[in-house]
Amino acid sequence: MHIEEIASEISNSISLAKQIEPFSKRGLVLSIQEAYDVARVVRQKLGPAEIVGQKIGFTNRNIWNIYEVDEPIWGPMTKSSVSYSDSNFFKVDLSQFCEPRIEPEVVVCLKQKPEFNTGTPEISLDWIAPGFEIVDSIYPNWKFSLTDAIASGGLHGSLVVGKKFKVSDDTEKDLIDVKVSLYRNCLLYTSPSPRDS
């Protein structure tokens, strides 16, 4: 199966919110680079949309075994998939997704794109904000390989960015101790440590 064919199937799945069998389960083994190439073609097929940032998925090594992945993945976020809410309230239409899940996020905005020419890049933060990402799996029951996830755009569905806070010298220290409480139907659902997420 050609990259173009795989990208067409994925873009149709996303557009119709209809799940498909993972390519890895069909014996189609993609390299990491091929999977990112597929994701690029998928973006083109879904129509022109300005890329405004990147999401990094699977940064929590504790869940790698659950999803059978062994490294983080990157996925583009576009102007059409990112929303802003200074009030920290926002309604998302979940009918556009296949099998959505919600994840609390600390959204980070860099002052400029890092240069990777000489070793470790110097990164300068502009602002941070609380946020929620709607992650979505076009593969049933969230069963997929690493390259399946990459090819589908890093499982990114939508991101809601809350009130922005300018970064100060104390921000890094404050982030280490930040706590998040999740409520469902006005009842406390979970309050994980930041080191667990």
Give the location of each predicted region:
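Catalytic-core "active-site belt" of small-molecule-metabolizing enzymes
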Residues: H2-L188
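Conserved small/polar residues in nucleotide/adenosyl-binding loops
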Residues: Y189-D196
